[in-house]
Design a protein with these regions (language model features):
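Acidic Gly/Asp/Thr-rich repetitive segments characteristic of extracellular carbohydrate-active
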Residues: 15-42
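Short glycine/acidic-rich loop motifs that flank beta-strands on beta-rich extracellular proteins
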Residues: 49-52, 71-73, 80-87, 107-118, ...
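Beta-rich ligand-binding surfaces for carbohydrates and other polyanions
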Residues: 380-500
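Extracellular beta-strand-rich solenoid/capping regions of secreted or surface-exposed proteins
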Residues: 27, 31-34, 46-63, 70-99, ...
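Fungal secretory targeting signals
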Residues: 1-15
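Acidic, glycine- and Ser/Thr-rich low-complexity intrinsically disordered tracts
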Residues: 281, 305-380
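Right-handed parallel beta-helix
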Residues: 59-65, 94-107, 126-139, 146, ...
Length: 500
């Protein structure tokens, strides 16, 4: 049995260290060595891979010889032109270890990979797995590090240790030209009774540490810093419904969170603070204490959609700058969130959204109404945006092509061009496709080089401003008439109310 093998036999090191080769070199050593095999890479080695490295038995380890913790750690990198996204996978093997190496998904070189995995994929029906002193960065997929659940709550992933890792950057903000979200997590935890401690995460763009339930886990003494170039959704997230929504005995303690460009959330807690707006509450009891939040974090702690006990005490957000309006914008948020933002509230909750017992520190702000989707904040938004010919070219449902203070302009999945103010349509092109644009979308909105604003389906024009040969720029503004097209002399030749 796996547990007996790991218990009674010492680790068996493969001969020497590996200075070159690829995943096949490493996989052969694991496959031939069996349980407890240790594969060590030489210091300063770079291993290019075109497919994932696979653990094959309990107790195996991959590490750098002499266990350095700095830049001399060996690097495993995804090769340009490769279809690989996950670098190391080890589902359901007990006591495996990934230690003292660097993992580079090489997103800039190999490219974003739609549907790609995390740099590290371990977990499953396993116990005692360890990731320690690892640098994981630039994932092609959705996370720098994923400890996956088993899918069976009666036999869960358990007792992992995620220690002293330096993680990031992970992902980018926004969408690509095909409408794919580019963001990624730092640590994605879906494993019970796990210790996540003393990690430093810089530049996560989805969640810094995302806790997928993971009952009994402790998240302690981690440092999470947002990118100075990309928005980050949340530093620590407790918003997902795995384990029937249970966060029983989860402890989030003594972590340091710093916003550079911006974090929407420091610590998000509950079913309704993210974008899901779930109909059921997540459940404790859980403890959030001794955390320090500083810098550009729009809402350091937000709580809504929770039951069965919560303690949030001794957290400090005194170094979050005030007023928030000097560095952030909440004009796309629901009214209760806008009110909390204007009040410069740092710790916020909605009373009816927290059932059963709660112990909240005294500086919590009680919202006037249901606060949902705290991902609505941003850096300060402009009042207008202007595109020249061929600068605006978007696929339907790819996010707003104008994100302004109080207003967004969006090309919808039915090929309708719509301007919304406070979430309500104030203008639309009116041309829609009953069958929709398809998946992948066959619809595009283009402000062409000839000055015509045109929607296309499968290469065929559907709607246009009729300004071909005359238009020079298109400007979207946050007040009526919302969209204007000007000629080379600056004269308005078309807007949403008239054509001249």
């Amino acid at each position: 049995m796996r547990a007996e093998t790991a218990l009674f036999f010492p680790a068996l090191a493969a001969a020497g260290c590996i200075s070159n080769g690829d995943q096949n070199t490493i996989n052969a050593l694991f496959r031939n060595g069996g349980a407890n095999t240790v594969v060590q890479l030489c210091e300063n080695a770079t291993i290019q891979i075109t497919d994932k490295i696979l653990f094959t038995a309990d107790g195996q380890e991959i590490s750098t010889q002499n266990y350095p913790t700095g830049s001399t750690r060996a690097t495993i990198r995804v090769a340009v032109g490769s279809s690989a996204s996950t670098l190391i996978e080890g589902h359901s093997f007990n006591n495996i270890k990934i230690k003292n190496i660097q993992l580079d998904g090489n997103r800039n070189g190999a490219g974003f990979y739609k549907g790609g995995g995390a740099n590290i994929e371990i977990g499953g029906t396993a116990t005692g797995q360890v990731i320690q002193n690892v640098n994981s960065r630039n994932p092609r997929g959705w996370s720098c590090m994923h400890i996956i659940g088993s899918g069976n709550d009666a036999n869960p992933c358990k007792n992992a240790q995620i220690l002293n890792n330096d993680i990031g950057p992970c992902g980018e903000e926004g969408h690509n030209a095909n409408g794919d979200g580019l963001w990624a997590d730092g640590i994605s935890l879906d494993c019970t009774d796990t210790l996540v401690q003393d990690n430093t995460i810089v530049g996560s763009t989805d969640g810094g540490i995302v806790i997928f339930g993971s009952p009994g886990s402790t998240i302690n003494r981690n440092t999470i810093i947002s990118s100075d170039q990309h928005l980050g959704f949340g530093a620590i997230n407790m918003v997902d419904g795995q384990y029937q929504g249970s966060y029983a005995n989860v402890k989030v303690t003594n972590n340091k969170i710093q916003g550079k460009k911006i974090f929407n959330l420091g610590i998000g807690i509950g079913a309704n603070v993210w974008s899901f707006n779930d109909p059921y509450a997540l459940k404790g009891p859980a403890t959030i204490t001794g955390n320090t939040i500083s810098g550009h974090v729009a809402f350091p702690i937000a709580l809504n959609g929770w039951a069965n006990g919560i303690q949030i005490t001794g957290n400090d957000a005194s170094d979050v700058p005030s007023p928030k309006s000097s560095w952030a914008d909440a004009s796309h948020c629901v009214q209760p969130i806008q009110q909390a933002f204007t009040a410069n509230a740092n710790f916020v909750y909605w009373g009816p959204g927290v059932a059963d017992s709660k112990n909240l520190q005294s500086d919590f702000y009680s919202a006037s109404g249901n606060m949902t989707n705290f991902l609505c904040t941003s850096t300060p938004l402009a009042d207008s945006i202007t595109y020249k010919g061929n600068e605006l070219n978007v696929v339907s449902d790819s996010g707003p092509f104008a994100d302004l203070h109080g207003v967004i302009a969006q090309y919808q999945g039915d090929s309708n061009v719509v301007v919304l103010q406070a979430g309500k349509p104030v203008w639309a092109s009116g041309h829609t496709l009953s069958q929709g644009c398809g998946n992948p979308s066959k619809c595009r909105l283009i402000f062409q080089g000839d000055g015509n604003l045109v929607t296309y389906y499968d290469g065929q024009p559907q709607w246009s401003s009729g300004t071909g040969g005359r238009g020079s720029t298109v400007t979207i503004i946050n007040k009526a008439p919302w969209i204007q097209i000007r000629d080379a002399s600056g004269n308005v030749i078309w807007d949403t109310t008239k054509s001249t």
